[in-house]
Amino acid sequence: MGIRGLMSFVEDHSNEFFTDLKLRDTKIVIDGYALFHRLCFSSNLDLRYGGDYDSFADVVQKFFESLFACNICPYVVLDGGCDISDKKLTTLKDRAREKIQMAHSLSVGGSGYVCPLLIREVFIQVLIKLRVCFVQCFSEADRDIMTLANHWNCPVLSSDSDFCIFDLKTGFCPLNSFQWRNMDTIKGTQNYIPAKCFSLDAFCHHFSNMNKALLPLFAVLCGNDHVNLPIMETFLSKARLPLGATSSKGRRHHRILGLLNWLSHFANPTEALDNVLKYLPKKDRENVKELLCCSMEEYQQSQVKLQDFFQCGTYVCPDALNLGLPEWVLVALAKGQLSPFISDALVLRRTILPTQVENMQQPNAHRISQPIRQIIYGLLLNASPHLDKTSWNALPPQPLAFSEVERINKNIRTSIIDAVELAKDHSDLSRLTELSLRRRQMLLLETLKVKQTILEPIPTSLKLPIAVSCYWLQHTETKAKLHHLQSLLLTMLVGPLIAIINSPGKEELQEDGAKMLYAEFQRVKAQTRLGTRLDLDTAHIFCQWQSCLQMGMYLNQLLPTPLPEPDLTRLYSGSLVHGLCQQLLASTSVESLLSICPEAKQLYEYLFNATRSYAPAEIFLPKGRSNSKKKRQKKQNTSCSKNRGRTTAHTKCWYEGNNRFGLLMVENLEEHSEASNIE
């Protein structure tokens, strides 16, 4: 939610509407969505390379450490999926278009604000590590945040202008004036965070002591994410809205000023609403009244009692209960163990695929992971008999169809995607948790087209990323080259390196090698950020990989977790993976890079051996050979298997002279064809 222009209006009148706070020794309810966006966009993180998740995790950790140092107890509340009415769909589509334009700008060296794909998952992982209390609401969180803050008599931290409308007992602290990086002390002992708190009383006093109860009507007349009626322009054009005394600053907010001054003349919302309707054609009045009243309800207390979740672990949401969803699904959603992507697919049979900083001239990067989503949709098909009566009643029966809002060029379109019909024991969502670990793991790996034996030498924490990488390599849409795969696998070594460095039992020599390699990775990452131009094709390839990982994680969560969830904060760093690509293309070899740390070298070999059997043969050819090989294949028109066999015979020990990659052992390429045919 959010009221257009209101936040900048109140900030223009900061001295009148805000009071200074020294925040300490209190609970605080935090709008999680607003916080992770704010931290992502205000921390000098590079947004071009698909996410420096390690750096973002560090920022999130420092933020909460500042709160802890001031004895501030945070409770983070995250938005869930869209509600059953889907009333924000138009707004969401508009935002999706805006994100595409910003992603395009970033991709060609311009500016823009686009969250990396896995930022929400990283944020939740950091909350869990720090033991910060959090909940994921079933749908939009604003009302639940307001209700909880009033129950606990504590402030709200957000950047959403709707919190200027809610009647909050202890007030609303905007994130942009919450100076957590500039912690101060009282008498040299008690830490506090300087902040500003919005005063609703001062705001209403400024407008002739207007009744607070009029503000929800102001919000819907002004236009928020839920209401944007063209007919309201009729009212605004006919009503002579008094601007009052306006400064040069106030002219850009003439609609806000006019509405507030006009509304301040009425005693209550009923009187004001009747006067609004007078300006509209009689035939429209009843419908408009119903819509406005319904939208004003969005600013009332919520029925959800989040304090029960934080104190007892019970989350009761009437809207969710009315849908008859399985209990385990509701619990997993509240705990953030299932993504809002799942609830959108479940409730609306519609998902929105977020754009990344990718090549806009190519098909969107999420195309590659569509088969994984089709399995997810198949698992959600028979979730509840109530869903067909609610979300799907206006459409002709399409029992296997889901819709996806996706990027096409620099716009969006809605595509109809068929779900995969699964075996009977997989198609009952309520009983999915009863399936054995073996069955759930089998479904996950069959979807990813990976043999379980391939993953046996892989550390538990990397099994899912490696399985996803095998899936990614098998798809023809992926134009990955050897250096892309190598860079990705090298980046996966960061977590194990940190573990070696922090392990007290390791010998000094091992620790030194790990420290040196980690320092080299940090140097590469820093060098990449200095301004090298983004390689769009490389960016697109890694966007495809991230999409596969995201959907692989969502399927893994839904099954639930037959493989451990990877630590995203140490798994992928966009700046590092792009920098390693450049180095491997220029001169460095993997062998020379890893020579300083034998443990990392051994792990890399395990990862490489697992993935190489799923890679197309041409990925291992020296530069210049791949294209000629393709031409030769066309000319000879031989079968795929014969070509693979012949390639293997000729490329068992290629030495890639240009890049000094050393010997690339590819004697097991035949396994690729076997692994693609999972039973």
Swiss-Prot record:
The protein's matches in InterPro entries, at most eight in alphabetical order, are given as: Asteroid (IPR026832), PIN-like_dom_sf (IPR029060), XPG_DNA_repair_N (IPR006085)
**What would you give as a GO molecular function for this chain, any one?**
single-stranded DNA endodeoxyribonuclease activity
Q: Where is this region: Disordered?
A: 625-645
EC number of the protein? 3.1.-.-
Q: Which GO terms describe its biological process?
A: double-strand break repair via homologous recombination; double-strand break repair via nonhomologous end joining
Keywords attached to this Swiss-Prot or TrEMBL record, sorted alphabetically, are: Hydrolase
Chain residue ranges for the region called Interaction with SHLD2: 351-400
Basic residues: compositionally biased ranges = 626-635
Q: Which domain of life is it from?
A: Eukaryota
Q: Which family does it belong to?
A: Belongs to the asteroid family.
The entry describes its oligomerization and partners as: Interacts with SHLD1, SHLD2, SHLD3, RIF1 and MAD2L2/REV7.
Q: What does this protein do?
A: Structure-specific DNA endonuclease that specifically cleaves single-stranded DNA and 3' overhang DNA. Contributes to the control of DNA double-strand break repair choice by antagonizing BRCA1-dependent homologous recombination (HR) and promoting non-homologous end-joining (NHEJ). Recruited to the single-stranded DNA ends by SHLD2 and cleaves the 3' exposed DNA ends, therefore inhibiting DNA end resection (necessary for HR) and promoting DNA end protection (necessary for NHEJ).
The name under which this protein is listed is: Single-strand DNA endonuclease ASTE1
Which organism was this protein described from?
A: Pongo abelii (Sumatran orangutan)
Q: Which gene encodes it?
A: ASTE1
